[in-house]
């Protein structure tokens, strides 16, 4: 994905300028943050996936306890219009690194960026690992009717209220308003 992102950087910049009128500096910052996330994940993935020794409860004093990270499963990423590249690709990098499959729904309010992202992701990943859905509110509603193990959406996302309601009803894990919580690190409370 890192090489494909570098290869399509100019096309992405044109799309960001077409959709949002972003300056070259702002575009490079958005793309650079994604490239930085990819490099960071490549460096630290081994440590993040390692089995960790944890405290054993007193009742099982003779045993040893470990915690092993495991993927959630299928992740839905609904990105907003204001940072279409960053808030689509950064959670995707984390979801893929964690071993999840993903359905990516770029914003309909940034159509040029959404089309470039679709081409980029289809070039990088087979459709059984990463699927891209283009469209508006109808597609958002249809996606939210499906079962996902993790849903990422942002406050600026048009499907925010519906997505938040869906997450609360089904107890899906969710990230809203921040991309600091990664699909690999967050756990649902039992």
What feature does the model see in each segment?
Residues 1-66:
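N-terminal Rossmann-like NAD(P)+-binding subdomain of aldehyde/semialdehyde dehydrogenases
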Residues 2-4, 15, 35-42, 120-124, ...:
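Alpha-helical structural signal in soluble globular domains
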Residues 7, 11, 22, 33, ...:
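Short alpha-helical
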Residues 28-31, 81, 106-108, 134, ...:
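Short loop or secondary-structure boundary microenvironments that flank
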Residues 30, 37, 74-77, 174:
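Residue-level recognition of specific faces of alpha-helices
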Residues 37, 115-117, 187-189:
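Short secondary-structure transition/capping segments
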Residues 56-128, 171:
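Conserved small-residue-rich beta-alpha loop and adjacent elements
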Residues 74, 124-190:
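Conserved NAD(P)+-binding/catalytic subdomain of aldehyde/semialdehyde dehydrogenases
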